[in-house]
């Protein structure tokens, strides 16, 4: 069955905010100070937990969320900041936004945390994001490599055994679908899980797309244990062993999370 924090959204929001404050922001600040008044956009802001950590640092924030229910929850999470004019939450597709009409300023920093692996045309979104950034602007990406033990997000499945079984998302689609059906997963759950199988991204593919769309990698960290596991499972975050980070393709299978900071090239 899904873990309790997948169902209790208040716990989930607190975990996301704490993780952003303790790990995500310090990672970014190795190269880019987070200062008051900085313009920050989060794409796929969910219920607003990550963006809240940046607002607490004095940033001006915009949250973009495609799902109406999550956008409404984000507005509740950030109601004080929205009321003061420090933040807005938009229930829109990123491709439907008119940068010049919708915003008074371009952005210093864009955040995509656990989002890029859900987007179908990752090449197109990277190209599109250049339009939102100031010259020399930055993007943070955090994502699980597709081949990692739970890269198929199977931990959210209803069946207890499936939610705890690593790597079975790598099976061929017909067999994968058959197992999900045999263990009683709902049609919606199966559809969502198969969609992730279509959009999962590897370290190598991500870096090729970054270069193709004229971004430079400023920072990268390979995590053996994802920082969010501290809050979900009481596991101490650990960076990946240096030797394993240098083995292309294999590193995807043993790295649970990647953090990147990339910069827009001229």
Task: List PLM regions with ranges.
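A short beta-strand submotif of the Rossmann-like class I SAM-dependent methyltransferase core
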Residues: 112-113
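S-adenosyl-L-methionine-dependent methyltransferase catalytic module, highlighting the catalytic core
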Residues: 120-128, 138-263
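Short, surface-exposed alpha-helical recognition segments that flank or form part
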Residues: 12-19, 117, 194-197
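Conserved N-terminal segment of class I S-adenosyl-L-methionine
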Residues: 1-105, 109, 126, 225, ...
